[in-house]
């Protein structure tokens, strides 16, 4: 029996492999921003590659958090219930807290130090994280095996995403 094109199913692209502006999370945050404006400009991060690139577990955890906090509220707003006012808390509206958390996650992987989510190497995706790039880019964290491969044959090494010269912090 010869395989046909119908026999092969192309898996959908992973959300974390897409530019941030094409993800479901970005769309949800844009909807939220229409309801409650914040100091963060989502267009500034639209084409970024967030720290979770390739890390579906971390991405899905945060997406579930955003949906659980705001899913029903966004749906009610979309249906025309514009009279809803955001519930305020000590640190601002829940949306502003979600936005602030997202902003920090895009720029600095604080979840590594908190131990909340068990991080894996962003290069091989299997080994636990051993180092975090601590130069200005903060794009990626790696295991010791991938660190050795990245730094082989050079004076130091560069971030594989932005080519910024790196130094490391061990965990």
Swiss-Prot record:
Which keywords appear in this protein's UniProt record, sorted alphabetically?
Metal-binding, Zinc, Zinc-finger
Q: What family is reported?
A: Belongs to the IIV-6 157L family.
Protein name, as recorded:
Putative RING finger protein 027R
Zinc finger regions typed RING-type: which residues?
121-163
Which InterPro entries does the entry mention? Znf_RING, Znf_RING/FYVE/PHD
Species per Swiss-Prot/TrEMBL record: Invertebrate iridescent virus 3 (IIV-3)
Q: Which GO terms describe its molecular function?
A: zinc ion binding
Please provide an example of a Pfam family that matches this protein in its UniProt record: zf-C3HC4_3
């Amino acid at each position: 029996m010869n395989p046909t094109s119908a026999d092969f199913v192309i898996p959908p692209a992973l959300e974390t492999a897409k530019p941030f502006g094409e993800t479901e999370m970005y769309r949800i945050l844009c909807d939220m921003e229409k309801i409650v404006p914040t100091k963060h400009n989502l267009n500034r991060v639209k084409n970024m590659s967030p720290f979770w690139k390739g890390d579906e577990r971390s991405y899905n955890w945060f997406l579930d958090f955003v949906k659980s906090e705001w899913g029903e509220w966004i749906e009610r707003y979309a249906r025309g219930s514009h009279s809803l006012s955001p519930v305020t808390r000590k640190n601002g509206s829940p949306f502003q807290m979600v936005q602030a958390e997202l902003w920090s996650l895009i720029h600095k992987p604080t979840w590594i130090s908190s131990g909340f989510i068990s991080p894996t190497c962003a290069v091989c995706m299997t080994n636990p994280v051993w180092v975090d790039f601590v130069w200005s880019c903060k794009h990626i964290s790696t295991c010791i095996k991938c660190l050795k491969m990245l730094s082989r044959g050079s004076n130091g090494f560069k971030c594989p995403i932005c080519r910024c010269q790196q130094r490391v912090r061990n965990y």
